Amino acid sequence: QQESVLRAMFDAQAGAGFSAMKTPIAGTDFMSAGPFYTYDPVPGDVQMKHFSMARDLGPNGVITYIKRARRYGHFVLQAPMDYPPDWMLFNPDTNQDVNPKYYDALARYYLRYLEDYQKNGVFIDYLSLFNEPDVYTKIPYKEITVLLRDHVAPLLEKSGLKTKLMLSEAPDRDDASTNYPVLMDDAGARNYVAVMPYHGYDFKEYSKIGELHRRYPDVPLWMTEVCYAYEAGTPKSFALPRYEFADGDFWGQQIFNDLENYASAWIYWNAVLDEKGGPWSVSYIHGNPDPNIQHPVIIINRETHEVTYTGLYYYLAHFSKFVRPGAVRIETTGNYPGVRVMSFKSPEGKTVSELMNSRKQDVEVAVVENGRTLRLKLPAVSITTAEW
C-alpha cells in the first residue's frame, strides 16, 4: 500500500497535495533505517574527504523516498539539522556548542549535503542550520549569526546553488520572538535570511509570531514543526497515536491561529508512523531521547498493514489541496460562535474559503463576497472548503 499512501499525500487531484515538506540532515529522533548517524563521523575531517550519503541512497533511504513521493506531485523541501558530527562540538556528551575552529568545516558539511542531494536528483529549497538550537546542538544565536553570515552564506553563494537560507528553527513562538532579533538585527546576516521558521510546541503564543511579522514584514514566517508528543509535555491524558477524527479540530485551530498571525506555511512533524507512535532512534553518544511516542498524519500498523488517515490528515488536506502555493490570504469579517472562516485568493483569481465548525451540531452559514451569497450547511465538528 505504499504507493497509495504516497498518492494520498502528494497528488493534488487524488490526495492532499502537500506542497511543503521537512527533511532532516542525517540522523534525527525518528528513523527507521538503523542507528543515529551523521554524514562524516571521522574526527578532524575538515575537508569532508569521508563524507558519505550512502544511508540516504539505500532502498529505505531519504533520497529514495523523496524521489518516490515526487512522482505524485511537487513539493518544496526545507532541511534542518539536529546535530553536526560530534567531533565539531566542544563537548559531545552534552551536545555543547560548535567549536568556532570548525565553522568552515561545518559550512562545507552543509554544502556537501546540498551538492550530493542535487547530484542525486533532489534539490533542497531551504537550508536551516540548526533544529531547535536550545534543545539539540546548544549554540547561542549570536554564534549562529556569525556562522551564517561569515561562513555558510558566502560558501553557498560562491557554489552557485540556488538553495535559500532559513534562520535556525526555534522550539516555540516565544523563543523565536526573543531570539530571532539577535540575528535579524544584524544587517549582514539578515540579507541572507529568506524565511523565519519556528516550531509550535507552546500551543498558544501566536501573537509572538504576529509581532515578528510586524518587525520584519519582508521575511516570510513558516511554522515548520509541531506534534502531539508525551515528551513535549502536551498532551498526557490519552494514548498516542490518535485515531479519532474529531482530533483534527485541534489541529485546525492551530493552523488558523498561525495563518492569522502571518505564517505562510505549516508543516507537521512526522507524516507517517506506526501503531506505537514510532519508530524512534537511539544514539550511542546522545543516548535514548525517547520513547518519544508521537502522533502522525498517517498511521500504518506494522502487523496488519492497515492504513489510518487521521483527522489531522483531512484538516491539513483541506488547506494543502485548495490553498495552493501563490495564494494570498484576504480579509474575512463576521462572527459565529464556534465557527471560524479564513479566505484566500488563488493565483488564478478564485476565492477559496476554509470554514471550520467546532460545534457539536450542524450550523448553517452564509459567505458573502461582492454581493454574491453562498449558503452552506457545516456538519458538526468538521472543516469545509468553498471555492468559486
Give the predicted meaning of each segment.
Residues 1-124, 146, 150:
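N-terminal catalytic cores of secreted or lumenal carbohydrate-active enzymes
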Residues 19-25, 29, 76-80, 125-129, ...:
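Structural recognition of the beta-strand scaffold that forms the well-ordered cores
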Residues 42-59, 92-107, 131-145, 167-171, ...:
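The substrate-binding groove and active-site-proximal loops of carbohydrate-active enzymes
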Residues 54-58, 62-64, 143, 154, ...:
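Glycoside hydrolase catalytic-domain groove-lining segments
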Residues 87-186, 205-214:
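Active-site cleft segment of glycoside hydrolase catalytic domains centered on the general acid/base Glu
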Residues 171-194, 230-240, 276-278:
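Substrate-binding cleft/loops of secretory-pathway carbohydrate-active enzymes
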Residues 220-315, 331-332:
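Aromatic/acidic polysaccharide-binding cleft in carbohydrate-active enzymes
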Residues 318-322, 331-370, 377, 381:
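Carbohydrate-binding surface patches
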